[in-house]
Amino acid sequence: MVINPDGTVQRLCKLVPTPFDLFIRRFLPASINTHLRRQFELWESGYNKVMFVPYLSGCFMFLRCTALKEVGLFDERFFMYPEDIDLTRRMAMKYDTVFFPNVTVTHEHGAASYKSLRMLWVHAHNLIKYFNKWGWFFDNGRRDLNRKTLSMLAEGNQK
């Protein structure tokens, strides 16, 4: 589990995003987008159990070398921001990508794209490359991974 320096949980277990998810999350105030964020960031899981998650943050992850060799390294086309979405998505398509709440690390989230127009441009530019790779609106892989995740959470299944 990744926590902030003040001890609060960083909600880094997520569904594979749609362009709409990322737009809402980035540009609408939390008071308006809370319901969508709760589902996208899997709040209902409680972040207190081992669970399958198709998109895990790149700030802290362990990967099997054999799996990494099979699915490939980070995609160099987008160095910053969607690289962890792409890698964990490719891993989740062949392996279980799993959140373990029993290990805790502290991460000071920089949120550079919220503080700098240049970094916001880099973020947007790389997201365009990501969605060009996987599909903007019609993405069966995203749909299937997200359905699997939500179904497992609804059933209370753990890994």
Task: Go through each PLM region and give its residues.
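Residues that scaffold the ATP/ADP-binding catalytic core of kinase and kinase-like folds
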Residues: L12, L22, R26, E70-V71, ...
